[in-house]
Amino acid sequence: MTDTSPEQRVHDLLVIGGGPAGAATAYWAATAGLDTVMIERKTFPRDKTCGDGLPPRAVHQLDEMGLGAILEGYHRFDGLRAIAHGRTMEMAWPDHPVYPSYGYVVRRCDLDAFVADHAVGAGATLLQGTEGLRPLDPPSGSPKGAIGGAVVLDKASGNEHEIRARHVVIADGANSRFGRVLGTTRDRTYPMGMAIRGYFESPLHDDPWIESSLD
């Protein structure tokens, strides 16, 4: 059953997806005083297959959000060590007037949780275990292609309800389910990579390089 109460509140912004992109969006919107709601279909802390490496530009963005002190508790790396066909190259991050010359390795289960918490601390509302199902029609007179929010599913109860918003940011990943409802598709002629991720102990755990083997 979907709650369609006509007196339902209209938020300034609905963010669909609580990963780093969605949570950063929610943080900056809430900081600017916007009434912001962010939904995430899983519950934090939750994992995601990823290399866990934050390059300098990502470090800069997180530092701008006030998260630099948290990052300092994680492993710092200064560049990339590439190994291919018996050759090894160590490539340091270049000096830049804005971005730092280092990155950090942060597990996604940690990163996603503390960025989302930071958005909540700034005033955003986070609904975990909530999945965006389909868009709502916008008010009359809205620009072509606009949507007025989303019908969402509370996965714990199985109930659907509407979240209305003046603006919607869809940040639920490359395989966006909500995006597919809007008509986005993946070009199957474009190359796609697959990944397997695992954690293990290594004598190189404190090495200042992240290592990539290209053989």
Predicted regions and their residues:
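Beta1/beta-strand and adjacent pyrophosphate-binding region of the FAD-binding site
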Residues: 5-21
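Short alpha-helical segment within the catalytic ATP-binding CA
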Residues: 23-24, 56-57
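A conserved beta-strand/loop capping segment in the N-terminal third of enzymes
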Residues: 59-113
